[in-house]
Amino acid sequence: RDGRLDVVFCEARENAVVWLRQQSPGVFVETRLAEKMSAPVHVQAADMDGDGDLDLVVGAMGVVFPNNDRIGTVFVLENDGQQRFTPRAVLENTTRVTDVRPADLNGDGRLDLVLGQFGYDQGEISWLERTGPWTFRRHVLLELSGAINVGVADFNGDGRPDVAALISQQWEEVHLLLNDGGGRFTPSRIWGSTNEDYGSSGLVVCDLNGDGRPDLLHSNGDGFGPAATPGPRPWHGVQWQENLGGGRFRHHRIGNLPGAYSPIAVDVDRDGAMDVVAVAAYADWNNANRRVVSLMWFRNDGKQTFEPRVLARQPKDLITLAAGDFDGTGRVSLVTGGFYIYPPYDALSRVTLWQPTAP
């Protein structure tokens, strides 16, 4: 906590969690915080033990590629205050974990954990209720395979945190679980596609139109799918679920982006309107002129009409995206991470910091 933004990310193929500490402006030093986690895919900072230090919550799949075994794990990397981290497995031998979000779901003042568990044939949305310093009780909220992301916010304005979930596989749906209090939740499906190759790939909570109600951004760009040939699809892109209040949502298509992943809402041009930025994990790199897109900005005109603007055409196969003020100027920078499975193996970048060129 030196006032400079750092980067923490998962190396799923190397079973590691990595910290890029910004030692001085624009200079980062790499430290591996854990190297024996099986396919970690999500990490988030939170003070899980209430000691004033940021710990790290990690969801690990066991293996990234399809598997029905109960090989998922949830870890907390406990920070001792000197930036030394001790791994604690708080859930083991479970269906593959793709997302984990800290939140106090039952209002007892302690952080619980909300999980997206992809599994394969079997998966769940669940939450871990805090019962002690490092002990949790698991509750299943929804039994569906293919969970990609979960999000936590008060979606219906009753003062209690609710849960949203993006489900892929054959379902291709967005679900809402309204918190009724006392650990009880009412599930509903707020949107779904009839296309089993839709490719749901990422979900984030945001207030895109600035009305004070939390909305949902989600992408469809997964190029694995049931089709024989992996790669981008013409229907890939980014969607907005506008929160109308009372648990009701209206679906909007933001725009097309083959291979779309990891959408975020951020005011790129500082005009007071939230824009949308997303990366592309799959593109047609066999195309002769390689006029593909790897980083796309959907500029908001202030009336929730979005104009696509290409920010970059390489590096290829970007799968994750975050934003922040990395240089202390108040301007938004972007951070992307790559995941490389398919050739060609050029135009690669492990982690990239994108800094604004205009004042």
Question: Language-model segments: what does each one mean?
Answer:
Residues 1-359:
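Beta-propeller-forming repeat regions
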